């Protein structure tokens, strides 16, 4: 039974457990419920399922560079089906002020929110165990972060250059 696709570093596409939204496949995906393209600006609510090349898939990961450099993205609500926020997935989203990280996410990848200078606070759910290298580096507007006991690894420079950070709980 085929449930999704996953892109590998060599760009060959293999069918796996779920769809990883990446910069390369993003424009080929539409919201399964509405049939409309997934927006990359404003207040975005990511769908739990998408249609990709005529087949329906559950979104399981926000992959590398999926929203990188989307300067008009202001908020994002990630569906419960997502378990990983990948490398550089939201890097350079200068106007991103709000993000909802769902309970199913276990890993926030390297550079995931790098340079999201308008992000003010982040609440990391109890399911997260790893915060990747430089995950929030350069988030100058970040004033508070809630890190649960479930996090067992905070990689090098995860919160480096967060000059406004005053509260970590």
Walk through the language-model features, giving the residues of each.
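Consensus positions within tandem repeat domains that build extended binding/scaffold surfaces
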Residues: 63-66, 86-91, 109-114, 132-135, ...
């Amino acid at each position: 039974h085929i449930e999704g696709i996953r892109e590998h570093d060599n760009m060959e596409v293999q069918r796996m457990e779920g769809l990883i939204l990446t910069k390369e496949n993003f424009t080929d995906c539409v919201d399964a419920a509405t049939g409309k393209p997934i927006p990359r600006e404003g207040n975005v609510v990511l769908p739990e399922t998408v249609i990709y090349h005529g087949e329906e898939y559950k979104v399981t990961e926000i992959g590398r560079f999926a929203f990188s450099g989307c300067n008009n993205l202001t908020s994002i609500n990630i569906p419960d089906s997502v378990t990983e926020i990948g490398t550089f997935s939201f890097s350079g989203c200068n106007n991103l002020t709000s993000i909802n990280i769902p309970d199913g996410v276990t890993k926030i990848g390297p550079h995931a929110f790098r340079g999201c200078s308008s992000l003010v606070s982040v609440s990391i759910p109890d399911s997260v165990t790893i915060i990747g290298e430089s995950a929030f580096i350069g988030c100058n507007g970040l004033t508070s972060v809630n890190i649960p006991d479930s996090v067992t690894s905070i990689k090098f420079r995860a919160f480096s250059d967060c000059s406004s950070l005053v509260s970590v709980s």
